[in-house]
């Protein structure tokens, strides 16, 4: 059994899995855990493991948001495979919590701004703010991830932003996605992602017999 109590970017866990060892990895940040999950899934397609300590439902997400808003932001950003903005730094983010890169024509890379709100009260002003950030940053789209359900005026304001025409179809420029939506498998509608957004781990040889680990 390999125990890595500070698994960070997952190098030790990756090596243990490649060698067919049982392992347990521990980290205090949801950002690190989500990146390790992605690394393992890329390197070992079909791998099975358990993740403990991350929200499994809306109530769990609300508890995380109440305990630590930054951990909630990093966790929520990982659910839409966005690149965390500013890494693990805490503080002013200019209205940007994550970035999603995509290729609207299959060649040129563009971006969507992700804004996360874990509070119980959300308002139309937050959608207007996201629209301003999208314009300021030269982004093509914006995604508003919220724990609380959006209000009618928020939905109306998002609709006013119009649509983004791409070679792969038409997409709403501003989209509101709730945590409940994400748990139901309903994420933002976007053009094909840019595979270079995250550095992908190379696939490993699956010929070795492996045992089911825990994370």
Language-model segments: what does each one mean?
Residues 6-10:
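Class I SAM-dependent methyltransferase "Motif I" SAM/SAH-binding loop
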Residues 1-5:
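Conserved class I S-adenosyl-L-methionine
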Residues 14, 24-215:
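Mixed-charge (Asp/Glu-Lys/Arg
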Residues 11-21:
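Conserved SAM-binding loop of SAM-dependent methyltransferases across substrates and taxa
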């Amino acid at each position: 059994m390999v125990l890595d109590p500070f698994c960070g970017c997952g190098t030790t866990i990756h090596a243990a899995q490649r060698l067919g060892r049982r392992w347990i990895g521990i980290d205090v940040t949801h950002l690190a855990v989500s990146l390790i999950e992605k690394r393992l899934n890329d390197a070992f397609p079909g791998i099975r493991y358990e993740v403990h300590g991350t929200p499994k439902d809306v109530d769990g997400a609300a508890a995380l948001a109440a305990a630590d808003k930054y951990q909630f932001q990093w966790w929520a950003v990982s659910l839409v495979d966005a690149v965390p903005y500013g890494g693990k730094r805490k503080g002013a983010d200019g209205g940007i919590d994550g970035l999603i890169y995509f290729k609207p024509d299959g060649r040129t890379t563009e971006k969507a701004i992700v804004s996360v709100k874990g509070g119980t009260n959300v308002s139309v002003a937050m959608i207007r703010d996201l629209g301003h950030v999208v314009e300021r940053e030269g982004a093509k789209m914006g995604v508003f991830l919220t724990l609380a359900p959006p209000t009618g005026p928020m939905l109306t304001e998002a609709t006013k932003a119009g649509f983004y025409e791409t070679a792969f179809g038409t997409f709403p420029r501003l989209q509101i996605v709730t945590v409940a939506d994400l748990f139901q498998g309903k994420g933002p509608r976007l053009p094909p992602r840019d595979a270079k957004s995250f550095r992908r781990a190379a696939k490993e040889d699956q010929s070795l017999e492996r045992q089911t680990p825990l994370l």
